[in-house]
Amino acid sequence: MERMGLNEIREEYLKFFESKAHLRLPSFSLVPKNDKSLLLINAGMAPLKPYFTGLQVPPNKRVTTCQKCVRTGDIENVGKTSRHGTFFEMMGNFSFGDYFKEEVIPWAWEFTTEVLKLPKNKLYVTIYEDDDEALDIWVNKTDMDPKRIFRLGKEDNFWEHGLGPCGPCSEIHFDRGAGEVKTSEEFVKASDEDKIVEFWNLVFTQFDKDEEGNYNKLANPNIDTGMGLERMATIMQNVDTIFEVDTIKAVLDKVCKLSGANYKEDRVKDISIRIITDHIRSITFMISDGILPSNEGRGYVLRRLLRRAARHGKTLGINNTFLHNLTDIVIENCYKNYPELEEKREYIKKIIKLEEERFDETIDAGMQILNDYIKEVKNNNYKILSGDKAFKLYDTYGFPVELTEEILEEEGISIDKEGFNKEMKEQRERARSAREETNYMGAEDTILNKIDLNINTDFEGYDKLEVKSKVAVIIKDEEFKNEMEKGNEGVIVTYNTPFYAEMGGQIGDTGIIYNDNFKAEVIDCKKNISGKILHFVKILDGKVALEDQVILKVNEERRNNIRKNHTATHILHAALIKVVGDHVQQSGSYVDDERLRFDFSHFEAVSEDELKEVEKIVNKEIMKANAVNTKVMNIEEAKQQGAIALFDNKYKDDVRVVSVGDFSKELCGGTHVSNSGQIGIFKIVSEAGVAAGIRRIEAVTAFKAMEYVDHKNNILKEAAQILKCNEKELLNKLNHQVLEMKEKEKEIEALKLKLASGAEDEILDNIKEIKGVKVASAAVKDIDGNALRDLGDKIRDNMQSGVVVLGSNYKGKVLFVAMATKDTVAKGVHCGKIIKEVATIAGGGGGGRPDMAQAGGKDPNKLEDAIKTVETVVESLVK
């Protein structure tokens, strides 16, 4: 056995299966496509599900891949052990109804023993206990020693997930110190002790499990294999853990260099070093695939990983931002197989640095709050932190709840998860509502995805808006039908169509389908998971049946407006790169007949001057009346010509390139004008942030742009009429009015202060004494926070000894302040505790120091009730 680098193992594997007539596919994105059962791709076969289920036709019946994967199910163990990690690569070879056991078992043995040259006396094989066929092949088609083959039960060697495709599997294992194993029992024991490790799983998908629990044979069985690249590298490099594998150790060494820590010298530091080493790999690949930090979904997973790694950097004594610098090491070791990493290097680093800086802004304050919570819990001999406090750390300071749990665990404290989940309910409901019912293989369980794969629709809509065709499929009420009549709504599929199906941010076409006997309104047009074009229709007249000859006609005016907006989006993209910077990348878009929306990577608001310049450039390109050309070419040729590709798309070998003069060139399957002059005019309506590092521009074109300008002009005219001036005088008039209002506001505030001073005497006259402590409390009207604090200071100073609690209803908001002299604090008074109890009654919350605290409330009607509780609260605190 010769030592092999991780990258070398990957290449040897893929080359081997290419030699067996497999198509090598690049790794799919970590973001699942058309699979709502997964947040992130977590297995080699996950992106290939549509091929296994028959929903899509594979590009080849034999495929081999090395798939990047992220799993965070056992993230709490990452770092604590040297085995766990969130990022890994899974090598696999797959057969979609082509070869089966008789081919894959000898191939697996050939690769293992002849390419990797693993010693045969170090290898073991397991099979499903009833799989005599697999045993026969291992014994008679390879030179594997039969004594080293063990039959195991369903739990170990049968792959199934609920109902549907399933089957037995055979695994190849490597002896890492077990010595000679003679029985299944000895084998299982050695595996549990990690003395024998599994490195390749061959799954034979040959059954379909039905609802009665029967295993029915599949007509076309499949092969699905998986070999963990990192685990294989530990074997080939004779190291104990993934953190000692060449490419991963390079990252670990950089972490040690940045922190000044030495690996394997301090158990606690080793945990932090491993966490950072693992997490930066996941972080780099996730951002490369277009995922951005957020508080929901996969963006939350990324934020959690990033902030967990940043926090462990601080544990190692790294007090500045550092994670973005580790990205270079990850990319240097991976870019040959993942060229997108190099292409997006600067973008990835900017996103990481931005998130690090945001976390840095809050972590110190958040840690101080958390430390206070820990002290409070311990002082009260509690073992649980309340859910509302954990939620405050999450909501205000950006602490993922898992990070809070991890820190608390070190102190022997847990979180009230029920209380936290209650606080999180709104966010969780939003996330849950976005999910639709799916089956276990990830496809939406709908009749629309069960259309015969042999039925194809040719799209002719680039050049035509009206075509003749035949009806291939009719769907109504979630069933395939032979006909559909007036008043019904459903789906029609034809053999060819001019209707553009919603895709790439462009909305689907509308129009009509008709013949002499019927007429249907097309209200939408989409694609199903296998790419079939679906016309969503309402039958207006007559009846339509399968194989009827029909005419399909697109709403021309609507399509033309969509074209204008789509081409304008391309010009906008190019203008943004020119004005804002070449880091700009599209992260989403939406184009319909009324407006366009463009999301792009940028790290701050686009300035007014920049927006004006962008708008000017776009209109300049429109006025040039540039020809808009489309050309189908090889993907590599398109890239060489500088065509912009979408951030997270995987493209076929041949792509459609849309060019607007020599100003813009993008890969695009949408519909466009033939000349930029047809757009007419372009106006930006808004610019805003939608996520960390992502901005959004909304704009209108043509007549909608004219309507927008007219609307703005009408507002100016109405404003001038209200101020009784002409439009030229409007700005001067407004400035004068604003200055006048500010003077009036100053006068009003001065009057309020006078009133507050008058209230001071009344409050002092009504002081109560509770257990030897003077208490002044009152609700005052229309005083802002500053004035309320000033009033509190005066009353406390006048009292010389005591506590004062004031509340105010200011512009519909409730404000509270509490102050106490030092001697009353010594007697047990704690303003933070008082203010928390009082503010809760008015629907608010807050806290602070023993001698001073402030809070807010939501219900002005409860202000008086809240103030009435002050004396009771003080009484409960005074010793």
Curated annotation (Swiss-Prot):
PANTHER family: ALANINE--TRNA LIGASE, CYTOPLASMIC, ALANYL-TRNA SYNTHETASE
Keywords from the named record: Aminoacyl-tRNA synthetase, ATP-binding, Cytoplasm, Ligase, Metal-binding, Nucleotide-binding, Protein biosynthesis, RNA-binding, tRNA-binding, Zinc
Gene Ontology molecular functions: alanine-tRNA ligase activity; aminoacyl-tRNA deacylase activity; ATP binding; catalytic activity, acting on a protein; transferase activity; tRNA binding; zinc ion binding
Positions with a binding annotation for Zn(2+): H566, H570, C668, H672
Name the UniProt record assigns to this protein: Alanine--tRNA ligase
Known function: Catalyzes the attachment of alanine to tRNA(Ala) in a two-step reaction: alanine is first activated by ATP to form Ala-AMP and then transferred to the acceptor end of tRNA(Ala). Also edits incorrectly charged Ser-tRNA(Ala) and Gly-tRNA(Ala) via its editing domain.
Cofactor annotation comment: Binds 1 zinc ion per subunit.
Domain of life: Bacteria
Phylogenetic classification of the source organism: Bacteria, Bacillati, Bacillota, Clostridia, Eubacteriales
Entry domain remark: Consists of three domains; the N-terminal catalytic domain, the editing domain and the C-terminal C-Ala domain. The editing domain removes incorrectly charged amino acids, while the C-Ala domain, along with tRNA(Ala), serves as a bridge to cooperatively bring together the editing and aminoacylation centers thus stimulating deacylation of misacylated tRNAs.
Family: Belongs to the class-II aminoacyl-tRNA synthetase family.
Gene field: alaS
Main localization category: cytoplasm
One GO-annotated biological process of the protein: alanyl-tRNA aminoacylation
